[in-house]
Amino acid sequence: MVAIRMISVLLLGLTVSGCASIETATRNAPLDVGGLEAPAVAVDVRDIRVSVPETLRVSEANAYLPAGDIVWRGDPPGNRHDQVKAIFEEALQRGTATMTPGHLPVVVEVEVARFHALTEKARYTVGGMHGLHFVMQLRHAETGALVGKPELIKANLRGFGGQAAIEADRIGQTQKVRITDHLANVIRQELSGPDGYVAANLRLGGLSGQL
């Protein structure tokens, strides 16, 4: 059982993100999906379920901004859907593992919507942004009822380029390490306060954004 501390379970928001050289995570208008309107309560995470739909398109093109929903080079060539799922599972387990359990038993369901990391071409030249999008929904662990509404979270992370990327790799801060740590922090904040994870509203720079 994974424990988390007090949170506000008013799950609102819908956002999109793209590729640029900033770090950000935002939430927007609520999805029009039914569910229990939950008050601020302490929750107890009983399970974490991650899905990466097969409909998400994988790109292996070595371009600055390749088309596709999944762009990932931080693991050896293989099933990118499975690799992305493993990253999210590790991040969510780590992000909730140290939190204190509350009174409402829940399952955290996450569906990946976009996982757009940097290609070799971008990483070793100008850098950019890792576009990390996922839909999160809480469900009552015993009744299966929805708790609050699902939200699409944009949890983007600035990706190093050029010499900075080389130095990051040298000290063990690979794309995989940084993205996993970042997602763990995002989910911890999302499940720890009434406003969830909200990053600074920074100007875009470097590569242009891509929806």
Tell me the role of every PLM-derived stretch.
Residues M1-S8:
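Bacterial N-terminal signal peptides that target proteins for export
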Residues A40, P76, R80-V84, F88, ...:
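Extracytoplasmic/periplasmic, Sec-exported soluble proteins
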Residues A20-H81, G196-L211:
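A structural "domain/chain start" motif
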Residues T15-G18:
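C-terminal motif of bacterial Sec signal peptides marking the signal peptidase cleavage site
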Residues A63-L65, D69-G78, V147-Q189:
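Short secondary-structure boundary motifs at beta->alpha junctions and helix caps
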Residues N79-H103, V110:
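Mid-chain, structured segments of secreted extracytoplasmic proteins
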Residues T98-V147, G159-F160, D169:
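Surface-exposed short loop/turn segments
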Residues A20-T26, Q163-L211:
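C-terminal/domain-edge helix-coil "capping" segments
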